[in-house]
Amino acid sequence: MDRPLLGPVVKIDHEGKRTALFDPAAFSQLALDRADAFSPASDGGLYQIAQSGGLKPRIYVLHFSSDGSPSSTTLLDAAFEVYTFAAFAGGNFLVSGVKRDVRNKNDRGRNFTAVFSADGRELAQLSFQAPQESAKASAKKPNTNGAEKATPGLDLADAEIGSDGNLYVMRFSSPVLVYVIGPSGKIMKTMKVASPLPGALPSAFHLSGNRLALSFWNDENQRKTVVVADAQTGRKIASYADPTSLGPSFACYSANDGVFTFLKLGEGNELEVIRAEAQ
């Protein structure tokens, strides 16, 4: 499973100019081995999940200020491989990954998802019923050059905070499942979003207002399709086929403007920001 190590997170404005750099190396006292998923903080800063240690890893939540400077750290009362992470507005954290015995090479591990308090205490463990077609979906996982990769077999693949204070969390499955999870760890709602075409599988999603925008990839025709659905019911409202290459990474969605934002590397490894309007 390919994951980044200690690369920074860059915040850019609507013109693509860098406004802040969130670098986990700034927390040098933690001797981090890797830093992975990140989530916006309610104060304009950023949370990022990070790890140090080998056989007994220590899982930290790094808190950056809005200007990118290090603010604080939280040590989670847990030891597992984290792949999905998101922060609630009130300070609790949703963390999902795999627990395994690292001393046993044959241990494939088990899924583990929990909500932790702002001071690192485990508040609730969550369990999810495996979707009927999740194994098939994992076998046909879309290849998007690592830009929108969802790890096979995990409970959860992507998460964003809603205006209601709950997290909206996507599962890599067919049909797509989106869970609405409260700060206490209660699963408030489960929505199904149908794939736009046979063989199309989810690669990313974003939440804006009362709309979900999900990006699907079809290996057969190498095409991306974006589906907009109702964030309360999962009902499909519209779908948009991508006849040209908008970029592999679906970065943002604005329901009010009807604008989808994609990222890709251009010439000289410069980041290109591409915006597409719904038509």
Identify the role of each PLM range:
Residues 13-17, 64-69, 117-121, 182-186, ...:
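Short loop/turn segments that connect beta-strands within beta-propeller blades
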Residues 247-279:
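Blade-level signature of beta-propeller repeat domains, shared across WD40, Kelch, NHL, RCC1
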